[in-house]
């Protein structure tokens, strides 16, 4: 719990407006710690065994987020494997190549190619995973980058990454917006989260509350073909995920956002997810996209798109 509270206090330092939630945050993190993953202490032990590293150089503004430095590569790799599976990346940590399941740099490059900028902004990443995008935001000039995600494994992975990157302007809060309301961000992103929510409109409203008037919301999600009335709901699982509820068309997603008083700034083309972007690596001890596609060949192929909208 101390690690979570330290991250919260860092967030308040970066965003003083969050101080009004301080009492709530104390309760939220205490309750969350009581429900923590049974292996969390084991993960913390592994992280503590990582040597204190003074990186020679840190490179955040590139596909492979890199910390250059000298270290025992075998020991580093062994300890990082204790935190598997690694989903978002890639990273290079003192010579150890952390080739994660997702080439998250593909997604970020699509945003950059569309002219997306976080330079000088306070950024919130909802469903941040292990924090890969937090580092990319800082590399792109963000004033600060705060991530929320309820996964204690991802939180442990972020704590491990921070041993290498040591970025005080990157903050991870192991919680959700359901439990801890946040506000005052210039840009809020939710990438790969919307389809996990049973009430997507309520979730979009939560995101709206987190972004300042005139600020930007970025929604990146699985989509289907169709008009503004088209939404697909899987019968059970979808590409290996049991917690997938609503996959809108791009037009339907825009309609939802407009109803919530956003102005659509940009809609991307839908891009099919391939095994070049999501695949099994030696850092993932589970199935991946290629396996899931074989299980349900009749389901709509996974395609992703993003919408950038401005809060009015």
Curated annotation (Swiss-Prot):
Similarity comment: family membership: Belongs to the class I-like SAM-binding methyltransferase superfamily. CmoB family.
GO biological process, one term: tRNA wobble uridine modification
Biological role: Catalyzes carboxymethyl transfer from carboxy-S-adenosyl-L-methionine (Cx-SAM) to 5-hydroxyuridine (ho5U) to form 5-carboxymethoxyuridine (cmo5U) at position 34 in tRNAs.
UniProt keyword Transferase present: yes
Subunit structure: Homotetramer.
Name this polypeptide is given: tRNA U34 carboxymethyltransferase
Residues annotated for carboxy-S-adenosyl-L-methionine binding in this entry: 88, 102, 107, 127, 149-151, 177-178, 191, 195, 304
GO molecular function: methyltransferase activity; transferase activity, transferring alkyl or aryl (other than methyl) groups
Superkingdom of the source species: Bacteria
Name of the gene this protein is made from: cmoB
Broad enzyme group: transferase
NCBIfam families, per database record: PRK15068.1, tRNA 5-methoxyuridine(34)/uridine 5-oxyacetic acid(34) synthase CmoB
InterPro entries given in the database record: CmoB, Mo5U34_MeTrfas-like, SAM-dependent_MTases_sf
Keywords: Transferase, tRNA processing
Organism: Dichelobacter nodosus (strain VCS1703A)
């Amino acid at each position: 719990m101390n690690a979570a509270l330290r991250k919260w206090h860092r967030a308040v330092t970066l965003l003083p407006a969050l101080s009004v939630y301080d009492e709530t945050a104390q309760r939220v993190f205490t309750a969350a710690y009581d429900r923590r993953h049974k292996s969390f202490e084991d993960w913390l032990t592994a992280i503590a065994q990582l040597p204190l590293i003074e990186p020679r150089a840190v490179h955040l503004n590139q596909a492979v987020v890199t910390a250059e430095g000298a270290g025992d590569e075998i020991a580093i790799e062994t300890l990082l494997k204790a935190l598997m599976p690694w989903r978002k990346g890639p990273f290079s940590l003192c010579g150890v190549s952390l080739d994660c399941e997702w080439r998250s740099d593909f997604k970020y490059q699509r945003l950059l190619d569309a002219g997306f900028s976080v330079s000088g902004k306070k950024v919130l990443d909802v469903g941040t995973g292990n924090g890969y995008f937090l580092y990319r935001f800082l590399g792109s000039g963000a004033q600060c980058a705060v991530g929320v995600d309820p996964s204690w494994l991802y939180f442990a992975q972020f704590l491990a990454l921070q041993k290498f990157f040591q970025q005080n302007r990157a903050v991870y809060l192991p919680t959700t917006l359901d439990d801890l309301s946040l506000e005052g961000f210039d840009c809020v992103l939710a990438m790969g989260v919307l389809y996990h929510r049973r009430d997507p409109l309520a979730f979009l409203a939560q995101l709206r509350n987190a972004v300042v008037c005139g600020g930007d919301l970025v929604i990146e999600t699985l989509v289907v073909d169709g008009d503004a009335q088209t939404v697909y709901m899987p019968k059970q699982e979808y590409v290996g995920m049991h917690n997938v509820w609503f996959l809108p068309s791009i037009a339907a997603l825009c309609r939802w956002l407009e109803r919530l008083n956003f102005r659509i700034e940009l809609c991307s083309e839908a891009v099919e997810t391939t095994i070049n972007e999501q695949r099994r690596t030696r850092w993932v001890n589970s199935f991946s996209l290629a396996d899931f596609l074989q299980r349900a060949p009749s389901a709509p192929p996974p395609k992703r798109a993003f919408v950038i909208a401005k809060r009015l």
